[in-house]
Design a protein with these regions (language model features):
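Acidic (Asp/Glu)-rich catalytic clusters
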Residues: 2-24, 59-66, 104-114, 139-144, ...
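Well-ordered, non-membrane alpha-helical segments in soluble/globular domains
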Residues: 2-7, 89-105, 136-146, 186-189, ...
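Hydrophobic faces of well-ordered beta-strands that scaffold small-molecule active sites
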Residues: 18-23, 67-73, 117-123, 170-176, ...
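Flexible glycine/acidic-rich beta-alpha junction loops that bind and position SAM and/or redox cofactors
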Residues: 25-34, 72-74, 78-81, 180-183, ...
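Active-site acidic/histidine proton-transfer and metal-coordination neighborhood
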Residues: 32-171, 181
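Active-site glycine- and acidic-residue-rich loops that bind
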Residues: 125-134, 177-189, 211-213, 276-285
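Aromatic-lined glycan-binding groove of carbohydrate-active enzymes
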Residues: 189-272
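Flexible, acidic glycine-rich loops studded with aromatic residues
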Residues: 199, 246-336
Length: 336
């Protein structure tokens, strides 16, 4: 409590405020091997529930009056931890119940403080939710039916009121990098979610690596891509094959085989101000599409620039951390 009060004072003195948090990582997220442990503890555990509720209590204390707040979180769990159909179903059910406990906690916070906070579920490659179709299915098959029963029992609400509560407090975190890896066009995704009544709590402004095949040979491309192979984070690679997205669960798999391709996209958050670096490109075009859409359709009021890989970038892209962050913000403000 004293730390929180101290932090509040510092925020006030520096004329800044907190309206969003990244609740996906748990514990240290830098300078050590993370890989699939980024999902630990997942939503099948009480640890994840307790951690998230505690973060929301802190956000409720920090959030200035008149603002809304949100916390992004993992897409239930890591897909490959649940080997059978039954195990996957159980993980979705348990994860949904724990997220619904958070939704009821947020309902209580709003009743007591007047502050509206939402949990923003963040799909990502190899997560149990990777794309908008899987989000829709999670709501339809798990959150809504389980939630109607659970909220009805605990809060005495009828089915319609329970569904409204779920849609109010459980939203999507639209990470631009992640949805570009799913080869989804922003307009299509936004319209699909809106039609299903699913809100976008937060948009994370981020870019993935885009690798376009060179007709005269890819040696330079493979050499450039190898510089992004580092041991801290998972860097899934996706490819669109016959209309479907194929995922390789880490960069070394692609680098080892070096087979022919037209376009690959890699889960490596690169500086948003770079469209191209040497033989490689970025999905910066997706950021520009999202920004254009937002000007006409304000689907979310929370935007968070989310490049977290500064420590592991190839040396040619590394700059002073503060300067890099300022450059990203300046680029974004200039374009938006």
């Amino acid at each position: 409590d004293s730390n929180l009060a101290e932090f509040q004072q510092w925020l006030s003195e520096n004329e800044v405020y907190v309206f969003t948090m990244n609740g996906f990582p748990y514990g240290n997220f830098h300078n050590e091997r993370v890989k699939d442990d980024v999902h630990t503890p997942d939503w099948t555990t009480k640890e994840r529930l307790t951690y998230t509720r505690r973060m929301f209590d802190q956000l409720a204390a920090l959030l200035p009056e008149g603002n809304t707040g949100g916390i992004s979180t993992s897409p239930v769990s890591y897909k490959y931890w649940h080997a059978t159909e039954e195990a996957t179903k159980t993980a979705f059910e348990t994860g949904a119940k724990n997220m619904l406990e958070v939704a009821m906690h947020l309902h209580k916070i709003e009743q007591e403080t007047g502050k509206y906070l939402h949990l923003d579920i963040e799909p990502e490659p190899d997560g149990m939710l990777e794309n908008s179709d899987e989000v829709l299915q999670f709501f339809a098959d798990y959150l809504l039916p389980i939630g109607v029963a659970l909220i009805g029992e605990k809060l005495g609400l009828d089915a319609e009121a329970a569904k409204k509560l779920i849609h109010r407090y459980l939203t999507v975190c639209y990470d631009i990098c992640h949805f570009s890896l799913a080869y989804e066009e922003p307009t299509d995704t936004f319209e699909k979610l809106e039609k299903a009544g699913i809100a976008i709590g937060k948009i994370q402004v981020s870019a993935a690596l885009k690798i376009l095949s060179n007709p005269s040979g890819n040696d330079e491309i493979w050499e450039a891509l190898a510089l992004f192979d580092e041991p801290t984070y998972l860097h899934q690679v996706t490819e669109k094959v016959s209309g479907k997205v194929k995922t390789y669960n880490d960069l070394p798999i692609v680098l080892e085989h070096k087979r022919e391709f037209e376009e690959l996209r890699a889960h490596f958050h690169v500086p948003i101000f770079l469209e191209r670096f040497g033989a490689l490109n970025s999905t910066q075009d997706h950021i520009l599409k999202v920004m254009k859409y937002l000007k006409e359709h304000p689907v979310s009021e929370h935007l968070e620039i989310e490049t977290y890989t500064w420590d592991v970038l190839p040396s040619a892209l590394k700059r002073d951390l503060s300067e890099s962050i300022i450059r990203e913000i300046d680029w974004f403000v200039d374009k938006f």
